C-alpha cells in the first residue's frame, strides 16, 4: 500500500 520507490503492499 506504499507508493515510494516500489509500490509494495506494506507500509
From Swiss-Prot:
Function as written in the Swiss-Prot or TrEMBL entry: Mediates visceral muscle contractile activity (myotropic activity).
UniProt entry keywords in alphabetical sequence: Amidation, Neuropeptide, Secreted
Pfam families assigned to the protein according to its UniProt record, in alphabetical order: Periviscerokin
Tissue: Expressed in abdominal perisympathetic organs and abdominal ganglia.
Primary localisation category: secreted
GO terms of biological process kind: neuropeptide signaling pathway
Record-given protein name: Periviscerokinin-1
Subcellular location(s) per record: Secreted
Modified residues (Threonine amide): 11
Cellular component annotations (GO), alphabetically ordered: extracellular region
Family affiliation: Belongs to the periviscerokinin family.
Keyword hit for Amino-acid biosynthesis: no
Amino acid at each position: 500500500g506504499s507508493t515510494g520507490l516500489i509500490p509494495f503492499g506494506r507500509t
